[in-house]
Amino acid sequence: MEEIKRLVLAMQFMTRLPIPIEIDVEKREFYRIASYFPIVGIVIGGILSLLYIALKDFFSREIVMTFIVAFSYVLTGAMHIDGLADTFDGLFSNKDKSKMLEIMRDSRLGTNGVLAAIFIVVLKILFLTNIHENITLTALLITPIIGRLSIVFSMMISKSARGGEGLGGLMLGKVGIREFAIAFVISIATSYFILPLAVFVKILTISLFVTYIVSKYISLRIGGMTGDTLGAVNELAELTALICFVSVSL
C-alpha cells in the first residue's frame, strides 16, 4: 500500500493530471517517490503517443510535433522547462554562487532563460519531425522515461545546493542506489516491450552521460543541484534521447 501511495504522489508531483486523492507522507520519506518517476514518464509518453495517433492523419508532421511538444508541457505544468530557463538565467548571470541561486529563485525570466526555453522547444520539434515515422511512437514513449530516470540519476550523484531547502532539497542528498535501481529496472522492463534492449541501453547510456556532465558542471558552479537544475536535466536528457533517435533513423 505504501508503494501505491508513493506512485500516486509521484504522479501528482510530476504532472498536472487530475488525481483527486490526498496522500499523507512524512517529509523525511518524500524522496522515495523518485523510484516511480519512470512510471510518470510512461504515462506521459503514452498520452503523447495517443495524441500523435489522433493527429497524424490530419496535419503535417511539423504541426503535429508542435502540438506534441506543447502538450507535453501542459501535462507537466511546464515545470521542467521553467527550471531550465531559471537555470540558464542563473548560470549565465556571471554572478557569484549565492547570487546565482537567488536569480534562479526569482519568478521573473531573464533573456538567457527565455532564449534557452525557445531553443529547447524548437530543437525538440525539429528532432521529433526528423525521426523516421516507423519509430516515432517508440521515441514518444521512451523519451519521457529517459528524462525522468535522468532526474533520479542526477539526484543520486548530487547534493542540494540550498542545504535541503525547497522541493528539490527534499530529495537531493537522500535519493540513493536503491531508488535509482528501482527506477532503472522499471525503465528497462518497459523498454523491453517497445524497442530492442541494446538500442535502449545505448540511448540511455548517452543520456545518462550527458546528465552526469551537466550535473557535475552545475554542482561545480553553485555547489550542488536544485529543483530548477533537475528540471534542466530532464529537458537536456530528453533532447539527447531525441537526437539519438534521429541518428537511429538515418
UniProtKB/Swiss-Prot annotation:
Q: Which reaction does it catalyse?
A: alpha-ribazole + adenosylcob(III)inamide-GDP = adenosylcob(III)alamin + GMP + H(+); alpha-ribazole 5'-phosphate + adenosylcob(III)inamide-GDP = adenosylcob(III)alamin 5'-phosphate + GMP + H(+)
Q: What is the protein name stated in its UniProt record?
A: Adenosylcobinamide-GDP ribazoletransferase
Q: What is its EC number?
A: 2.7.8.26
Cell compartment(s), UniProt = Cell membrane
Kindly list the residue ranges recorded as spanning the membrane. Answer: 33-53, 63-83, 109-129, 137-157, 180-200, 203-223
Q: Which family does it belong to?
A: Belongs to the CobS family.
What's the short name of a Pfam family annotated to this entry?
CobS
Q: Which UniProt keywords apply?
A: Cell membrane, Cobalamin biosynthesis, Magnesium, Membrane, Transferase, Transmembrane, Transmembrane helix
In this entry, which stretches build a coiled coil? none
Stored NCBIfam families:
cobS
Q: Which GO terms describe its biological process?
A: cobalamin biosynthetic process
Q: Which InterPro entries match?
A: CobS (IPR003805)
- Which is a Gene Ontology cellular component entry for this protein? plasma membrane
Required co-factor?
Mg(2+)
Primary place of residence? membrane
Presence of the UniProt keyword RNA-binding in the record: no
Annotated function: Joins adenosylcobinamide-GDP and alpha-ribazole to generate adenosylcobalamin (Ado-cobalamin). Also synthesizes adenosylcobalamin 5'-phosphate from adenosylcobinamide-GDP and alpha-ribazole 5'-phosphate.
GO MF annotation: an example: cobalamin 5'-phosphate synthase activity
Instruction: Give the originating organism.
Output: Thermoanaerobacter pseudethanolicus (strain ATCC 33223 / 39E) (Clostridium thermohydrosulfuricum)
Q: What pathway is this protein said to act in by its record?
A: Cofactor biosynthesis; adenosylcobalamin biosynthesis; adenosylcobalamin from cob(II)yrinate a,c-diamide: step 7/7
- Tell me the membrane topology, using the record's own terms: Multi-pass membrane protein
Top-level lineage group: Bacteria
- Has the keyword Kinase been applied to this entry? no
